[in-house]
Design a protein with these regions (language model features):
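N-terminal glycine-rich FAD/FM-binding segment characteristic of electron-transfer flavoproteins
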Residues: 1-151
Length: 151
């Protein structure tokens, strides 16, 4: 089982939200791929390759990825995740991740699961509701789950 983590970065290093998403992805077991998208993102890809649990770093580098537009990145993530290549697609629960994951989920024709705080098993998560006052279990039988993960 493979998991795809979409990296948020500052063109030099991975954001802490992405590091948290990588840690959460390790709960799925299996291999973890990190997708680094941008313009001139060699340093980020090198940093991602040193993170524990990361199996493979996928780098997509082009001028039109330079501004980090969610629509461009979502289309790329959809092409990678379609066809059963990944069990889950994760991003950190930052503004980057919350902007991106609904688009990826829509392109994959699945429902996103936001603000996950615990991964119990593939397809079984915990997330807060009511302004964080209640933690609820969420179960998914979708072919691929698209998640934002709180660190």
């Amino acid at each position: 089982m493979r998991t795809l983590v979409i990296a948020e970065h500052d063109k030099a290093r991975l954001a802490s939200a992405t590091l948290g998403a990588i840690t959460a992805a390790s709960r799925f077991g299996g291999e973890i791929d990190v997708l680094v998208v941008g313009d001139a993102c060699d340093a980020v890809a090198a940093h991602a390759s040193t993170v524990q649990s990361v199996t493979r770093v996928l780098k997509a580098e082009a001028p039109y990825y330079g501004d980090g537009t969610a629509e461009n990145i979502a289309a790329l993530a959809q092409r990678l995740a379609s066809g059963g290549a990944y069990r889950a697609v994760l991003a950190g629960a930052s503004s980057f991740g919350k902007n991106l994951t609904p688009r990826v989920a829509a392109l994959l024709d699945v429902a996103p699961v936001s603000d996950v705080i615990a991964i119990e098993a593939p397809g079984r998560y915990r997330r807060p509701i009511y302004a964080g006052n209640v933690i609820v279990p969420v179960e998914s039988d979708q072919p691929v789950d698209v998640l934002t993960v709180r660190a």
